[in-house]
Amino acid sequence: MAKIKKGDQVIVIAGKEKGKQGTVLSVSEDRVKVEGLNLVKKHQKPNRVTGAEGGIVTQEASLHISNVAILNATTQKADRVGYQVIDGVKTRVYKSTGESVAVAK
């Protein structure tokens, strides 16, 4: 189960984008897309039905989920996330500080 959710602020901890920060756009089983990171050029065919033009499009490629860590808002460092039941509600908490993770919108 992925502990990183759409809208979370993350930092890349491995690979060519190491040290860069961004917001998670989408999460699949073991991969995440981060806004503005791991950009690739894709050759797009024109589509008559949708009216989309052809050409070379720059878009985000996915990163493996093990190469990113959630960014702790108070310490501005990479952190791990756990779950705790607080007042009968299961919430995500930072492992280092025990603070509740802000809900992504």
Swiss-Prot record:
CDD domains: KOW_RPL26 (cd06089). One of its GO terms (molecular function) is rRNA binding. The keyword Disulfide bond does not apply. Transmembrane segments: none annotated. It comes from the Bacteria. One of its GO terms (biological process) is translation. InterPro entries: KOW (IPR005824), Rib_uL2_dom2 (IPR014722), Ribosomal_uL24 (IPR003256), Ribosomal_uL24_CS (IPR005825), Ribosomal_uL24_KOW (IPR041988), Translation_prot_SH3-like_sf (IPR008991). Belongs to the universal ribosomal protein uL24 family. Part of the 50S ribosomal subunit. This is Large ribosomal subunit protein uL24. It comes from Acinetobacter baumannii (strain AB0057). The lineage of its organism: Bacteria, Pseudomonadati, Pseudomonadota, Gammaproteobacteria, Moraxellales. The gene is rplX.
